[in-house]
Amino acid sequence: VEQLQRLKSEFGASRYLTEARRQALAQELRLNEAQIKIWFQNKRAKLKKANGLRNPLALH
């Protein structure tokens, strides 16, 4: 639960992480960098999909 809150907090601050920030976050949360990277990728994709559904008139 704490890991998820921390990830959400980081995502709120910035949707993209630098390599150094990803490494620090991975160490802090005891996850590997790939897990952090994938979580951010999935979160961005989910957000993009949700925004697309809310605006059906947007050009794709």
From Swiss-Prot:
GO terms for biological process: neuron differentiation. It comes from Myxine glutinosa (Atlantic hagfish). InterPro entries: Engrailed_Homeobox_TFs, HD, HD_metazoa, Homeobox_CS, Homeodomain-like_sf. This is Homeobox protein engrailed-like B. PROSITE patterns: HOMEOBOX_1 (PS00027), HOMEOBOX_2 (PS50071). Belongs to the engrailed homeobox family. Its main location: nucleus. Residues 1-41 bind DNA. SUPFAM superfamilies: Homeodomain-like (SSF46689). Gene3D superfamilies: Homeodomain-like. The keyword Nucleus applies. Keywords: Developmental protein, DNA-binding, Homeobox, Nucleus. GO terms for cellular component: nucleus. GO terms for molecular function: DNA-binding transcription factor activity, RNA polymerase II-specific; RNA polymerase II cis-regulatory region sequence-specific DNA binding. The keyword Nucleus applies. It comes from the Eukaryota. It is found in: Nucleus.
